[in-house]
């Protein structure tokens, strides 16, 4: 199972994200990454399941507006990908992560109601400076949030 971590509302701190990622090393041996943008930082440890070679995270949309750190599996991602391609969305990977990200870019938070699967995620909108956190409706993939002074 992958691991995601991050912060919002702090000064940019890549070293903090690297330490967070080090603490969740057991969550994924297949890669790690961080994204720092203003008051938001996302970290990801990867356990490759789908598109082993190209699903590195955090992942950005092609226009750079959104970044995602995601853990889970959306079982209907191929159907969603087809819908999104019909709407003009293009893809550079075969990963469900990119489908989830493109779905959010297309439909906003309404995208989550279209997902059949288990997931926890953080999506940073660079234009709106807004962090969206979401998890599957049953909480199969937990998502913990802490508010600290």
Please give the residue ranges for each predicted region.
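N-terminus-centric sequence/structural signature that marks the extreme N-terminus
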Residues: 1-149
């Amino acid at each position: 199972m992958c691991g995601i971590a991050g912060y919002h509302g702090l000064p940019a701190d890549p070293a903090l994200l690297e330490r967070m990622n080090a603490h969740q090393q057991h969550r994924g041996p297949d890669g790690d990454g961080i994204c720092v943008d203003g008051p938001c930082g996302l970290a990801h440890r990867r356990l490759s399941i789908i598109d082993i070679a190209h699903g590195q995270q955090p992942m950005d949309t092609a226009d750079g507006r959104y970044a995602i750190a995601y853990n889970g599996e959306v079982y209907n991602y191929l159907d969603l990908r087809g819908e999104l391609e019909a709407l003009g969305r293009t893809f550079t990977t075969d990963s469900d992560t990119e489908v989830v990200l493109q779905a959010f870019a297309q439909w906003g938070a309404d995208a989550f109601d279209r997902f059949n699967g288990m997931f926890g995620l953080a999506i940073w909108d660079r234009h709106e400076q807004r962090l969206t956190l979401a998890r599957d409706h049953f909480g199969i993939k937990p998502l913990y949030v802490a508010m600290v002074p």
